[in-house]
């Protein structure tokens, strides 16, 4: 089993229904969840400080492009972690996770690891990456820092394929780039513009003075130089049959 484009079995596909499989929540369950939320700290979730909307392309098939919503926690000056959803609505589905590191951290990674990462410079300068409803003046310093970062994004739920549950292994995602294979479909951008009442073109013009990174490591965006993507394959393996305690 690998992270390919094979459609899901009919009973797990959408068939026009995009809702996840399962019964509607009962009143009792709603009350239990509200009570639990009041009693527990949920500290990791409360560290989320940013919402970014952008687009991602499947590493093995870049014609498959999705709008993504990153809910970002900054761990330190060089490292961020993102819970990625397919929308910013209350019923948004958690479709993956992205880790973001500074260029300083990235340069210390092994070359084989670097191949799994993508650059952010074009994505941000072209205004494909936006922070919905946040004034550009407020987010500008953070965006300028992010142009020099690299991300590794694993998609765990291919909702664009019609999957009603997370199926199969994760798929590696890539960022948009200024070459034909990496360009985002115009209709996706126009749809987002209409939703938020923005002009991506106008935002792009406002970012024209953002500094370009002096150098983007060629191991990132591996497909641009080599025309190869990556898929995850699942294989049976022998277990270590040693008890963790006597």
Where are these regions (language model features)?
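N-terminal domain-onset segments
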Residues: 1-79, 143-246
């Amino acid at each position: 089993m690998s992270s390919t484009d094979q459609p899901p079995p009919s009973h797990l596909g959408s068939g026009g229904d995009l809702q996840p499989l399962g019964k509607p929540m009962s009143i009792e369950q709603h009350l239990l969840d509200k009570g639990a939320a009041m009693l527990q700290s949920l500290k990791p979730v409360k560290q989320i400080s940013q919402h970014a909307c952008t687009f991602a392309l499947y590493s093995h098939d870049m014609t498959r492009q999705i709008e993504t919503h990153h809910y970002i926690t900054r761990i330190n000056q060089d490292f961020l972690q993102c819970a990625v959803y397919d929308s910013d609505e209350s019923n948004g589905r958690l479709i993956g996770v992205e880790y973001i590191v500074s260029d300083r951290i990235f340069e210390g990674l092994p070359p084989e690891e670097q191949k799994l990462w993508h650059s952010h410079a074009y994505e941000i300068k072209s205004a494909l990456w936006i922070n919905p409803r946040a004034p550009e003046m407020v987010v500008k310093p953070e965006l300028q820092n992010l142009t020099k970062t690299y991300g590794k994004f694993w998609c765990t739920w291919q909702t664009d394929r019609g999957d009603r549950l997370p199926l199969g292994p994760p798929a590696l995602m890539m960022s948009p780039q200024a070459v034909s294979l990496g360009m985002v479909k115009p209709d996706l951008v126009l749809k987002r513009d209409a939703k938020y009442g923005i002009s991506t073109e106008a935002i792009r013009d406002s970012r024209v003075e953002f500094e370009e990174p002096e150098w983007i490591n060629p191991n990132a965006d591996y497909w641009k130089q080599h025309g190869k993507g990556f898929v995850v394959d699942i294989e049976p393996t022998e277990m270590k049959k040693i008890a963790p305690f006597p």
